[in-house]
UniProtKB/Swiss-Prot annotation:
Gene for this chain: metK
Quaternary data: Homotetramer; dimer of dimers.
Residues noted as binding K(+) in the record, renumbered to the chain: 44
Binding site for Mg(2+): 18
An annotated Gene Ontology molecular function: magnesium ion binding
NCBIfam families cross-referenced by the UniProt entry: metK
Species assigned in the record: Acidovorax ebreus (strain TPSY) (Diaphorobacter sp. (strain TPSY))
Protein name: S-adenosylmethionine synthase
Protein function: Catalyzes the formation of S-adenosylmethionine (AdoMet) from methionine and ATP. The overall synthetic reaction is composed of two sequential steps, AdoMet formation and the subsequent tripolyphosphate hydrolysis which occurs prior to release of AdoMet from the enzyme.
Domain of life according to the entry: Bacteria
Length: 393
């Protein structure tokens, strides 16, 4: 990639239909893990106008009121009025869970290469990434796209912008100079609103567009990056019908929003609703943990990790490091350090990151990475010092 370029990432709010589905799936997972952390869960959700469908595979000793969990999640997001197209009190919730396949379970319970270790729950490849563009070691476009829709939800819920409704999308186009973030070229923010938003905004002595720019965008984005920035606020002019009424929502359909905004490859596996024996989730978290510690250690300014697994096999097929020429030691040497300092077998990941806990509902909106939440163990940089010492730095 050239040193001077534009790069864009997007995010969506907790009220986006796909994110509603993700949050319900992870709330189901948390409710199960609260009672039985050894459960096997693959909880999928569909949302549409006035309807929620819960399906997938669950093997557990927990007794969970799945319908109530779904309703509570919809209420927390803010869909509490029939005018919004889905309402936590009146929506239909259909439940259609099966148990995990015995064929899958036997491979996961007993790894073929080492019976003492848990095998991977499926084959697949996962990526982790970190870079020095932000203090959180995330790419700047996705980091700030998340913060925009997060603030939209905050101002909606606390009543400062009462005309806002739950569904929203953001997009940040960053200008890079010499390979580093220089300024923000364009911000797109589309937010659902009440039918009378123009009148309501006028009462606030600001136009709708000005209110969004001044109250949501400018408090979030670094002032020094707002040089001749273009703002596109609700470019279609109207966004009243939204959420599951506007589009059918499905679990796992925002995988780029959930990760790095397109800054690195994605293996294709979604996260929400999956227990950590599913390496789609746990290994992607571990790969972020590895990449972040490498950058925090000063071994590279940016780092991409790929791991791959076979179903029922504990040890990864490969652990590949790519630093795009920013490493202070060769990539193959960094990869060797990874193998020495991180246990990337599924059971090792679960223990290393303490993943058998009800911590997942919080991950399901505003990004799984780059958030300094105490539950997000994959964001720790506790191995950076050891990596730096082992590299002789």
């Amino acid at each position: 990639m050239a040193n001077d370029f534009l790069f864009t990432s997007e995010s969506v709010s907790e009220g986006h239909p796909d994110k509603v589905a993700d949050q319900i799936s992870d709330a189901i997972l948390d409710a199960i893990f609260t009672q039985d952390p050894r459960s096997r869960v693959a909880a999928e959700t569909l949302t549409n106008t006035g309807l929620v469908v819960l399906a997938g595979e669950i093997t557990t000793n927990a007794h969970v009121d799945y319908i109530q969990v779904a309703r509570d999640t919809i209420k927390r997001i803010g869909y509490d009025n029939t005018e919004y197209g889905i309402d936590y009190k009146g929506c239909a919730v259909l439940v259609a869970y099966d148990k995990q396949s015995n064929d899958i379970a036997q491979g996961v319970d007993h790894a073929s290469d080492d019976h003492l270790n848990t095998g991977a729950g499926d084959q697949g490849l996962m990526f982790g990434y970190a870079c020095d563009e932000t203090p959180e070691l995330m790419p700047a476009p996705i980091y700030y796209a998340h913060r925009l829709v997060e603030r939209q939800a905050q101002l909606r819920k606390d009543g400062r912008l009462p005309f806002l409704r739950p569904d929203a999308k953001s997009q940040v186009t960053m200008r890079y100079v010499d390979g580093k973030p220089h300024s923000i070229d364009t911000v797109v923010l589309s937010t659902q609103h009440s039918p009378d938003q123009s009148e309501t905004a006028t009462k606030m002595k600001a136009s709708f567009t000005e209110a969004i720019i001044e109250e949501i965008i400018k408090p979030v984005l670094p002032k020094e990056w707002l040089q001749d920035t273009k703002y596109l606020i609700n470019p279609t002019g109207r966004f009243v019908i939204g959420g599951p009424q506007g589009d059918c929502g499905l679990t796992g359909r925002k995988i780029i929003v959930d990760t790095y905004g397109g800054a690195c490859p994605h293996g294709g596996g979604a996260f929400s609703g999956k227990d950590p024996t599913k390496v789609d989730r746990s290994a992607a978290y571990a790969a972020r943990y590895v990449a972040k510690n490498i950058v925090a250690a000063g071994l590279a300014r940016q780092c991409q990790i790929q791991v791959a697994y076979a179903i029922g096999v504990a040890r990864p097929m490969n652990i590949t490091v790519y630093t795009e020429g920013t490493g202070v030691i060769p990539d193959d040497q960094i990869a060797q350090l990874v193998q020495e300092h991180f246990d990337l077998r599924p059971k090792g990941i679960i223990q290393m990151l303490d993943l058998l806990r009800p911590i997942y509902a919080k991950t399901a909106a505003y990004g799984h990475f780059g958030r300094e939440e105490p539950e997000f163990t994959w964001e720790r940089t506790d191995k950076a010092a050891a990596l730096r010492a082992a590299a002789g730095l």
